C-alpha cells in the first residue's frame, strides 16, 4: 500500500524508524520524517528525536505499516542536523 498520495494535517507527521517500537520508555528515540502536512515546520527527510511514547503505529484501511508511526509535531524534542 502506497502512502505517498495521502494527505495529512498539521500537527501530524509520519515518521519511519529502523526498528519497531514496543511499550517502554526510550529517551531521545530518533526517526526520519517521511510525510508532512503542507504547512508543517518540518520537511521530508528531517531526522527528529523525542521519547518513543508519543509514537502511534500508522494504520490505513486496516493495514498496520511496519516501522511507520504517526507523531504530533508538538511532542518533538529536537532535530538532528
Locations of the language-model features?
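Compact, glycine-rich, soluble single-domain proteins
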Residues: 1-81
